[in-house]
A protein has these predicted regions:
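C-terminal membrane-cytosol helix-exit motif in multi-pass small-molecule transporters
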Residues: 180-202, 391-400
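Short hydrophobic/alpha-helical segments at membrane-entry points of transmembrane helices
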Residues: 20, 106-112, 228-229, 313-319
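Residue-level signature of mid-helix packing/kink "hotspots" within the transmembrane helices
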Residues: 61-70, 155, 269-277, 361-362
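Structural signature of the two symmetry-related core transmembrane helices
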Residues: 83-97, 290-305
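Juxtamembrane intracellular "pre-TM" segments in multi-pass secondary transporters
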Residues: 1-14, 195-229, 408-415
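Helix-loop boundary and gating motifs at the non-cytosolic
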Residues: 10-62, 227-228, 232, 236-254
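Cytoplasmic helix-loop-helix junction between adjacent transmembrane helices
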Residues: 113-151, 336
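Helix-to-loop junctions at the C-terminal end of transmembrane segments
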Residues: 68-80, 276-287, 372-373
Length: 415
């Protein structure tokens, strides 16, 4: 495609955008495969009692996904977004097979190493490609739609695997979904997805944002907006790692069956996913700082309340509240990062952010696992809730008053 014929925008590129949304739903479904049943698999089939040992699969996933995120950002302009997406799906193919036939917990950890690499390559690629297609004005909406598809799929597949496990056993049937998702995701990406590098070149011609000499340092520490968002991303996934590993175990201790565990654990990513259709658009027109502050605060409150409630209704409501808080921040993270960086450095900056964000999975699993082993699950959950509230305070203090990056010149000329 020639640069002169390229037009940025959601409407102008709706076919490729819609295809990438579908692909990202399959990417999310691969994570949903594990959300409700892997901690149970650890206790019931492998006899693991140490919470740190059980959460080792999340540590493996988080570290490898974080590293894959970073290198996807670094290599996107060199290797190509589509090529990285296809490689990610190829790596995903053996994951459900390993989970079906694993006779040792180490194989489950290996499967999650592959899952982390695959997720880093596929999800990061689809995120960056959608940013490339739509341009600056609709980027929040685009990220909302992207994350909606991904995390709604997480919720749906988490529910389905919980239901199948309840009626037909934890293995092998729930993991057949993963075989379907990985094969179809690979075919769609390989045959129909088109690379978006030329869109970046087109947008870079009109960008007024200066390039940074050190993208990693600027995103992580130097820039107040970028660093505030980055720490919040880490804490967000830190608490998500804890929820992923400990919530099913907490619900097992409360004597919920697999079906109800599947429902409660599915509500959180489902609300998270669906809510982003609204919050993504809001991040284009409303204060990003306020959305990030209130989102992290809501998450922290919901998490701290978890150990004190025992009924299905109250826990389902908290799961929904946690999902709402996450929906407020997730598309806002990405749209803020994208708008604060030069188009030619966007992929690397997003990759740096996603490196730290997804290291949160590993850090959260380690902190909550060790705390749960020494003091109990309830104390681990409360500690993570406190850290999440602290993150909201950091946003309030460090992030500039407004981070909307409005194109004032464009607005004046339109008038």
């Amino acid at each position: 495609m020639k640069e002169d014929s390229i037009k940025l925008g959601l409407k102008e590129n709706w076919q490729q955008f819609a295809l990438l949304v579908i692909v990202n739903a399959f990417v999310g479904g691969m994570v949903g495969l594990e959300r409700s049943i892997i901690p149970q698999l650890a206790e019931m089939e492998f006899g693991l009692s140490s919470k740190s040992a059980i959460l080792s699969f999340i540590v493996a996933f988080g570290i490898t996904k974080a590293i894959a995120n970073y290198f996807t950002g670094r290599l996107a302009n060199k290797i190509g977004r589509k090529n990285l997406l296809v490689i990610g799906w190829i790596i995903a193919l053996p994951i459900p097979i390993l989970l079906i036939y694993a006779n040792d917990w180490a194989w489950v950890v290996v499967a999650n190493v592959l899952l982390g690499i695959s997720q880093g390559l596929t999800w990061s690629s689809t995120v960056v490609m959608k940013m490339d297609l739509v341009g600056e004005k609709q980027r929040g909406l685009a990220m909302g739609i992207n994350e909606f598809a991904g995390y709604l799929a997480v919720g749906i597949v988490a529910f389905l695997t919980g239901y199948i496990a309840q009626n037909y056993g934890i293995r092998p049937y729930p993991f057949y979904i993963g075989i379907f998702l990985s094969v179809l995701g690979l075919l769609l990406s390989w045959i129909w997805v088109k690379d978006t590098k030329t869109f970046v070149s087109q947008e870079a011609k009109t960008s007024t944002i200066l390039k940074n000499e050190t993208v990693f340092w600027t995103t992580t520490f130097k820039d107040k907006t970028l660093s505030a968002v980055t720490q919040a991303g880490l804490i967000n996934n830190l608490n998500d790692g804890m929820i992923w590993g400990l919530l099913p175990i907490l619900l097992l201790q409360l004597k919920f069956d697999n079906n109800n565990i599947g429902i409660i654990t599915a509500i959180y990513p489902s609300v998270w996913g669906m809510g982003q259709l609204v919050t993504g658009k809001l991040s284009d027109i409303y204060s990003k700082k306020k959305m990030l502050f209130w989102g992290m605060l809501l998450q922290g409150i919901a998490i701290i309340l978890l150990p004190f409630l025992t009924s299905f209704t109250s826990l389902a409501a908290l799961s929904a509240l946690l999902g709402l808080g996450t929906a407020l921040v997730y598309p806002t993270f990405l749209s803020t990062i994208a708008q604060a960086t030069n188009p030619n450095q966007r992929a690397e900056s997003v990759g740096t952010f996603r490196l730290w964000r997804d290291l949160g999975y590993a850090i959260g699993a380690i902190i909550s696992g060790v705390t749960a082993d020494f003091f109990g699950i309830q104390y681990a959950i409360i500690l993570i809730g406190i850290l999440t509230i602290a993150s909201s305070i950091i946003i309030q203090i460090r992030m500039p008053k407004e981070a909307k990056f409005v194109d004032l010149v464009g607005i004046l000329y339109k008038k």
